[in-house]
Swiss-Prot record:
It comes from Buchnera aphidicola subsp. Acyrthosiphon pisum (strain APS) (Acyrthosiphon pisum symbiotic bacterium). GO terms for biological process: 'de novo' pyrimidine nucleobase biosynthetic process; 'de novo' UMP biosynthetic process; pyrimidine ribonucleoside biosynthetic process. InterPro entries: OPRT, Or_phspho_trans_dom, PRibTrfase_dom, PRTase-like. Catalyzes the transfer of a ribosyl phosphate group from 5-phosphoribose 1-diphosphate to orotate, leading to the formation of orotidine monophosphate (OMP). It is an enzyme of class 2 (transferase). This is Orotate phosphoribosyltransferase. Keywords: Glycosyltransferase, Magnesium, Pyrimidine biosynthesis, Transferase. Its EC number is 2.4.2.10. Pathway: Pyrimidine metabolism; UMP biosynthesis via de novo pathway; UMP from orotate: step 1/2. PROSITE patterns: PUR_PYR_PR_TRANSFER.
Length: 213
């Protein structure tokens, strides 16, 4: 099985991915919903780490360290580092930020490997408003590091207020390379091949035509 389809299948079985009628924070009525917060077991995080690792290897990106934005990005960075070692024999360091600066003990807002003047991959689940990514970029640039790429689980490929998706807004800002494990196009292809899910095709295509980029 193609690993992208494997990821969608895994997400659907875990009820992380659902098809139906859902109101998003934006107010839009969506024919699908993706909730990565339901991935909360040891097996879940092992699998997620492997999906990110596969995506990183396939991208052929050159990088030195993984960075996980607090809070959801932290376990993703750890799991991906483990997967890269276990499956590709790459001993990749990781780093993450804390949301509260500490003046005592392990001072500062960074934990883990140094990112100073390193090539950094940012790992997050889904870019919605982009707040966590914006904050991460500031932290990384403060360390005189460069952003090799940003990896996310899902790109909804939707227009925002700027007529661009949040992801494409980032791409246009500084030509950041943003790679998603799956997109709405992958979801539609998956549903087309599943007889039990084909009823959702009209709504998915209509939604993509209305809000897609």
């Amino acid at each position: 099985m193609d690993w992208k389809k494997e990821f969608i299948d895994f997400s659907f079985k875990k009820k992380v991915l659902k098809f139906g009628v859902f109101q998003l924070k934006s107010g839009r009525i969506s024919p699908y919903f993706f909730n990565s917060g339901l991935l909360s077991t040891g097996i879940d995080i092992i699998k997620i780490g492997l999906f990110y690792a596969r995506s990183i290897i396939d991208s052929k990106n050159k990088f030195d360290v993984l960075f996980g934005p607090a809070y959801k990005g932290i376990p993703i960075a750890v799991a991906t580092s483990i997967a890269l070692k276990n499956h590709y024999n790459l001993n990749v360091p990781y780093s993450f930020n804390r949301k509260e600066y500490k003046e005592h003990g392990e001072k500062g807002d960074l934990i883990g490997s140094t990112i100073y003047k390193k090539r950094v991959i940012i790992l997050d689940d889904v870019i919605t408003s982009g707040t966590a990514i914006h904050h991460s970029i500031k932290i990384i640039e403060k360390q005189e590091a460069s952003i090799s790429s940003i990896f996310v689980l899902l790109d909804r490929k939707e227009k925002g207020i700027r007529k661009l998706s949040t992801i494409n807004h980032f791409r246009n800002q500084k030509s950041y390379k943003i790679i998603s494990i799956i997109t709405i196009d992958d979801l539609i292809e998956y549903v087309l091949e599943d007889k039990k899910l084909k009823e959702h095709i009209p709504q998915l295509i209509k939604y993509r035509e209305k809000y897609g980029i």
